[in-house]
Swiss-Prot record:
Pathway in which this enzyme or protein is active: Cell wall biogenesis; peptidoglycan biosynthesis
Domain of life the protein comes from: Bacteria
GO MF annotation, one: ATP binding
Biological role stated in the UniProt entry: Cell wall formation.
Residues that, per the record, bind ATP: G125, T126, H127, G128, K129, T130, T131
Organism per entry: Actinobacillus succinogenes (strain ATCC 55618 / DSM 22257 / CCUG 43843 / 130Z)
Upper classification of the organism: Bacteria, Pseudomonadati, Pseudomonadota, Gammaproteobacteria, Pasteurellales
GO biological process, one term: peptidoglycan biosynthetic process
Protein name per the record: UDP-N-acetylmuramate--L-alanine ligase
Length: 476
């Protein structure tokens, strides 16, 4: 590790007078990833969060000092304090840092500092950025380029969401939720798509969100590269406003890198990509869905345009095991009513839920799709209510859990009971509302049939509930 740190230090100067870096909200995947990279660079890392989780456990095992709970004393020796977007200005540690004149910065500002002396590749978009970031990271690793990467979710092939490489490459997921991706200064930027989400950040104005994405792309140097999805109407509307080289990809006939002949069998997808030079490249993926073909093609475009050969690209994509909680198969289980498959998925926006359902239908045509859905945030449920009603009506059986608030206060009419009523009124599926999470295993056991594909869907604690199901079924 010492030799690696010395090599990196020759390339990336250390931050002047920074010794101890404290993270408030260190248990988040994005925060923990940056903390892990800095820890491996040799900085003294401390952090706090309200509860232990896999991220805090990993950081502790690597030498980080983790506090459970927030206290002013946690920042006493900090040179700088890094805060996640979930941390409020009145947090006791933030207040204490200001009183001690310790710099307080956003997560993306620290990520930007990591990127400043490296060749940065930033992946943004409403959907698909975590998987695309993981795919690019694995291609560069396969090519022997030893990149640093910081992702918002687990890169299964690497067993972590962050890694400190010894090369000049840094591949990072860019966060639009608080517009903090504007701090980044990459050499290559990918935008997968743009849809209304996190609209409080953009004052409820979708045009403001679109302008912010254009500004993000203008953070590229004049010789930089913007990679944009040709299937996304909003992105294609913005292309004329982007004063940088733009290369597009997608199923659209107008795409520079065009996808053809997509087919899916179970978890496996395969298709062709036609390059601008007319080369036909056959891609094999072991993650399902057309949305993953788009993610993989974005990764291919970046790699091809940066001079990586086809062999490394194809091998990395064929070996790609997925990102954490992205159509994550937890297993097949024998129940009294028959054999079922359980899949855990992070998607929490109507579009994400829709492509997950589509992937399930395409790969397992003869199975019922049973969804356990936990809405995430009252504001998102309110803003996208009709879209949720439409997409959730596409499953065969729907179990609805209460909204996961993520720190928000309830909003009238944006709760799961209201959602259930509207879905029921549409007449396609009769939702089952489960208020008591402890009853979920019993409810699921009552409704499942032989061959069912069960999707545990959402960004809250539904993942823990799905693992409770596994434990229940394994013991039973």
């Amino acid at each position: 590790m010492k030799k690696r740190q010395d090599k990196i230090r020759q390339m990336v100067p250390s931050m002047r007078r920074v010794h101890q870096i404290h993270f408030v909200g260190i248990g988040g995947a994005g925060m923990g990833g940056i903390a892990e990279v800095l820890l491996n660079e040799g900085y003294d890392i401390t952090g706090s969060d309200i509860a232990e989780n896999a991220v805090t456990g990993r950081l502790s095992s690597l030498g980080g000092k983790i506090f459970i709970g927030h206290a002013a004393t946690n920042v006493e020796n900090a040179s700088v304090v890094v805060v996640s977007s979930a941390i409020k200005p009145d947090n006791v540690e933030v207040v204490a840092a200001h009183e001690k004149r310790i710099p307080v910065i956003q997560r993306a500002q620290m990520l930007a500092e990591l990127m400043r002396f490296r060749h940065g590749i930033a992946i943004a978009g409403t959907h698909g950025k975590t998987t695309t970031t993981a795919m690019i990271s694995m291609i560069y690793t396969q090519a022997g380029l030893d990149p640093t990467f910081v992702n918002g979710g687990l890169v299964k092939s690497a067993g972590t969401n962050a890694y400190l490489g010894a090369s000049r490459y840094l591949i990072a997921e860019a966060d639009e939720s608080d517009a903090s991706f504007l701090h980044l200064q990459p050499m290559v930027s990918v935008v997968t798509n743009i849809e209304p989400d996190h609209m409080d950040t953009y004052h409820g104005d979708f045009d403001e969100m679109k302008r912010t994405y254009v500004n993000f792309l203008h953070n590229l140097p004049f010789y930089g590269l913007a990679v944009m999805c040709a299937d996304d109407a909003v992105l294609m509307e913005l292309v004329p406003q982007v004063g940088r080289q733009v290369i597009t990809y997608g199923f659209s006939e107008k795409a520079d890198y065009r996808i053809e002949n997509y087919e899916q069998t179970g978890f496996q997808g395969h298709y062709d990509v036609i390059t601008p030079a007319g080369e036909r490249i056959h891609i094999l993926l072991n993650v399902p869905g057309k949305h993953n073909a788009l993610n993989a093609t974005a990764a291919l475009v970046v790699a091809k345009e940066e001079g990586i050969g086809n062999d490394a690209i194809l091998a990395a994509l064929a070996d790609f095991q997925g990102a954490g909680r992205r159509f994550d198969q937890l297993g097949e289980f024998i129940r009294p009513n028959g054999k079922v498959m359980l899949v855990d998925d992070y998607g929490h926006h109507p579009t994400e839920v829709g492509v997950t359902i589509q992937a399930a239908r395409s790969g397992w045509e003869n199975r019922r799709v049973v969804m356990v859905f936990q809405p995430h945030r009252y504001s998102r449920t309110r803003d996208l209510f009709d879209d949720f009603v439409r997409v959730l009506s596409q499953v065969d059986v729907l179990i609805l859990l209460d909204v996961y608030p993520a720190g928000e206060q309830p909003i009238a009419g944006a709760d799961s009971r209201s959602l259930a009523r509207s879905i029921r009124n549409l007449g396609k599926v009769d939702p089952i509302f489960v208020a008591d999470h402890g009853q979920l295993p019993e409810v699921v056991d009552q409704i499942i049939q032989d061959g069912d594909l069960i999707l545990a869907q959402g960004a809250g604690n539904v993942s823990r509930l799905s693992r409770n199901l596994v434990e229940h079924w394994t013991k039973a």
